[in-house]
């Protein structure tokens, strides 16, 4: 809806992440990933002085922890946890958590997992997730990746 944005650039958001990972053993890998999300426009409200303020900051910082344990050559258990670090005026996001299995064939990798976040875009998950995993608010996800062996 064009009425929500003054400029086209107000629609833009950005996500940056530094991925630090380590293959601990042949079967076990871990990852730590600090991230920064930026939204050019955030929802606002009018304060008691009549000024418009953002409900949330335009910038949001988070840190993610992930792990993968290979049960066999074709199957692995995967887990991920994203902890928001930025505190906003209202609507602070809930942490993202997911766990699942990965099955590989010679040409594809299939992942099926349960997580409490809803979007395919990571900056939306990190900044706006209101699903609380402690209350069982999980969704089911599925990924398929084509493996290329050149």
PLM segments and residue spans:
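Membrane-embedded beta-strand positions of outer-membrane beta-barrel proteins
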Residues: 16, 32, 67, 79, ...
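Active-site/pore-lining binding-face segments in mid-to-C-terminal subdomains
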Residues: 76, 80, 84, 91-104, ...
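Outer-membrane pore/translocation modules
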Residues: 1-58, 125-135
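Surface-exposed extracellular loop regions of Gram-negative outer-membrane beta-barrel proteins
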Residues: 63-78, 83
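Repeated loop/turn-to-beta-strand initiation elements of outer-membrane beta-barrel proteins
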Residues: 27-30, 73-79, 107-111, 148-150
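Residues that define the transmembrane beta-barrel architecture of outer-membrane proteins
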Residues: 8-14, 57-63, 93-97, 104-106, ...
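Outer-membrane beta-barrel "beta-signal"
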Residues: 99-108, 112, 117-119, 135-150
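Transmembrane beta-strands of outer-membrane beta-barrel pores
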Residues: 1, 36-40, 81-87, 105-107, ...
